[in-house]
């Protein structure tokens, strides 16, 4: 009788324990934590785990806060790196030794971000980020745009197109085509005035009218503004910021409006390329003729190509 009762009692005990676990999710959390702690304790006795703990600080990179530079004004932050001990150990355990290529990283965000800085123009991305961006200002040159768009698409490059509001109004289908291809759309004023000479009311009107035209036509609200000819004063920066737009300048100029030979344009750009470069161009014949070579050679130099938003993003690019 006793022998028959023992299995039944064990069954009842297990049943009530299981029921309690289902009723109490904290019990499951506790068991999970216990298992993890057990694994960690076991790993901590492994010389490989100890070696990993000792070497990990050598591979960590501190995050960089966004800042205002005396020369380059607003500079975006850049994520740091911290070794994920558990994931790295799991990979190394398969080979039984420390291997640098098995390190797994977690990204660490900076504490100061670009959007928290006082409004200043943005000339380039973070100097440690191996990415560059094409800034394509559009107020004319449709025939060259139609040559450039297929090249960008072929090489899977997304650029930031700064569109003049009046141009959008007169070129609805081409404006939609640019957006449909996945490019970022920015504000380039409504009719290309010298923004530095406008009253605050006229500055606001130029920005609002262009944003309204772009939103009405394409359905997106620009987050970046490029002043025509790069001409601005502090009020332009401040008013754009009030409208949730950053003011974008450049560090590399194709000077394509002077119609240089394609070889001259390419040398000009490639000799000045750098981490975080923002490359100004327009839809012109020399740019259309140079674009494919520029993309190929920029990539060959180890740079990624992205939009202004991607360039400003704090995410660290990993090889």
From Swiss-Prot:
Any one Pfam family match given in the protein's UniProt record, by short name: Polysacc_deac_1
KW Ubl conjugation (keyword) present: no
Family as reported in the entry's similarity comment: Belongs to the polysaccharide deacetylase family.
NCBIfam families per record: spore_ylxY
GO BP annotations listed: carbohydrate metabolic process
Molecular function GO labels: hydrolase activity, acting on carbon-nitrogen (but not peptide) bonds
Span of domain NodB homology: 130-306
Taxonomic classification: Bacteria, Bacillati, Bacillota, Bacilli, Bacillales
UniProt-listed InterPro entries: Glyco_hydro/deAcase_b/a-brl, NODB_dom, Polysacc_deacetylase_ArnD, Spore_polysacc_deacetyl_YlxY, TonB_box_CS
Superkingdom of the source species: Bacteria
Signal peptide residue numbers: 1-27
Organism: Bacillus subtilis (strain 168)
Keyword Cell membrane: no
Protein's recorded name: Uncharacterized protein YlxY
PANTHER family: CHITOOLIGOSACCHARIDE DEACETYLASE, GLYCOSYL TRANSFERASE-RELATED
Keywords per UniProt: Hydrolase, Signal
């Amino acid at each position: 009788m006793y022998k028959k009762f023992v299995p039944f009692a064990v069954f009842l005990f297990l049943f009530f324990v299981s029921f309690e676990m289902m009723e109490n999710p904290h019990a499951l959390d506790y068991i999970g934590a216990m298992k993890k702690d057990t694994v960690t304790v076991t790993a901590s006795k492994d010389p490989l785990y100890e070696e990993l703990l000792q070497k990990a600080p050598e591979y960590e990179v501190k995050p960089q806060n966004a800042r205002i530079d005396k020369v380059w004004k607003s500079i975006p932050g850049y994520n740091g790196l911290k070794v994920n001990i558990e994931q790295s150990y799991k990979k190394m355990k398969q080979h039984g030794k420390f291997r640098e290529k098995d390190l797994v990283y977690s990204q660490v965000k900076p504490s100061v971000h670009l959007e928290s800085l006082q409004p200043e123009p943005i000339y380039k991305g973070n100097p440690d980020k191996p990415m560059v961006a094409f800034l394509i200002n559009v107020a004319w040159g449709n025939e060259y745009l139609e040559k450039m768009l297929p090249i960008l698409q072929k090489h899977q490059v997304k650029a930031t197109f700064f569109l003049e509001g009046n141009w959008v109004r007169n070129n609805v289908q081409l404006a939609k085509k640019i957006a449909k291809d996945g490019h970022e759309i920015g504000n380039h004023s409504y009719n290309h005035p010298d923004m530095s000479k406008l009253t605050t009311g006229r500055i606001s009107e130029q920005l609002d009218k262009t944003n309204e035209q772009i939103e009405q036509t394409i359905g997106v609200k620009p987050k970046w503004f490029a002043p025509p000819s790069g001409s601005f004063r502090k009020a332009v920066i401040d008013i754009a910021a009030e409208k949730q737009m950053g003011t974008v300048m450049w560090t590399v100029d194709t000077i394509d409006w002077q119609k240089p030979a394609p070889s001259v344009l390419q040398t000009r750009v490639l000799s000045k390329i750098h981490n975080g470069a923002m490359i100004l161009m327009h839809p012109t014949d020399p740019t259309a003729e140079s674009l494919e070579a520029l993309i190929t050679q920029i990539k060959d130099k180890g740079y990624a190509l992205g939009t202004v938003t991607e360039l400003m993003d704090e995410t660290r690019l990993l090889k």
